[in-house]
From Swiss-Prot:
Protein name: Ribosomal RNA small subunit methyltransferase J
InterPro entries assigned to the protein according to its UniProt record, in alphabetical order: 16SrRNA_methylTrfase_J, SAM-dependent_MTases_sf
Gene name per UniProt: rsmJ
Positions with a binding annotation for S-adenosyl-L-methionine: R96, D97, D168
Gene Ontology terms: biological process: rRNA base methylation
Compartments where located: Cytoplasm
Pfam family, one: SAM_MT
The protein's Enzyme Commission number: 2.1.1.242
UniProt cross-references to SUPFAM superfamilies, sorted A to Z: S-adenosyl-L-methionine-dependent methyltransferases
A Gene Ontology term for the protein's cellular component: cytoplasm
Sorted UniProt keywords: Cytoplasm, Methyltransferase, rRNA processing, S-adenosyl-L-methionine, Transferase
Catalytic reactions of this protein: guanosine(1516) in 16S rRNA + S-adenosyl-L-methionine = N(2)-methylguanosine(1516) in 16S rRNA + S-adenosyl-L-homocysteine + H(+)
Molecular function GO labels: 16S rRNA (guanine(1516)-N(2))-methyltransferase activity
Family: Belongs to the methyltransferase superfamily. RsmJ family.
Amino acid sequence: MTDILIDNTATETVRTLIRAFPLVPVSQPPEQGSYLLAEHDTVSLRLVGEKSSVIVDFASGAAQYRRTKGGGELIAKAVNHTAHPTVWDATAGLGRDSFVLASLGLAVTAFEQHPAVACLLSDGIRRALLNPETQNTAAHINLHFGNAAEQMPALVQTQGKPDIVYLDPMYPERRKSAAVKKEMTYFHRLVGEAQDEAALLHTARQTAKKRVVVKRPRLGEHLAGQDPAYQYTGKSTRFDVYLPYGTDKG
């Protein structure tokens, strides 16, 4: 489990949010590694010995740019956003792609299984709902804490299948800015890199009605060594499209 240091300045709203996740409250930072810090109205990820931190903030920086420019992104084409599909993001992480998809007006169900990451994302969505510039987009995201491969089959029984299942398995970041590299260092140290890619892709293809979209590096290997039906390729990123089992078009 991840430690969380709750500062005296932490609001009651933040304290309530934290209690929804299996985190370990501590009175001081650990001697090494990463931990969460709750202070004022924000939860952040810290790495012992580093001054910088990671928070989920959809109203500024790169997230703001992607939110306002999202309609022209390759991801929009990959999910065929003009058809207004429902999207289940099975690997939400810090929620950037979920937010871009939601900014397109799509209904996004986001799954995140790591409690610390889910806490960071939940906090980011909460603050986005309070900001006039981001509240409409944030309202399109429904966050589920848990393993997507385990939760999706049960959710299908109550909500039906989504049009799209979106996957963004972690992979090494190359040719990125120093800020992005540092953030990914924090993230990888927190959650590790072990993922059962084959099982995740299998469940996604069982779940989606129209297509499974997988984000990869432009020159990266196919997920679980499985060839996609077709691809959308950009300068640094590629989206591989897999069809649901038993279908011949997406």
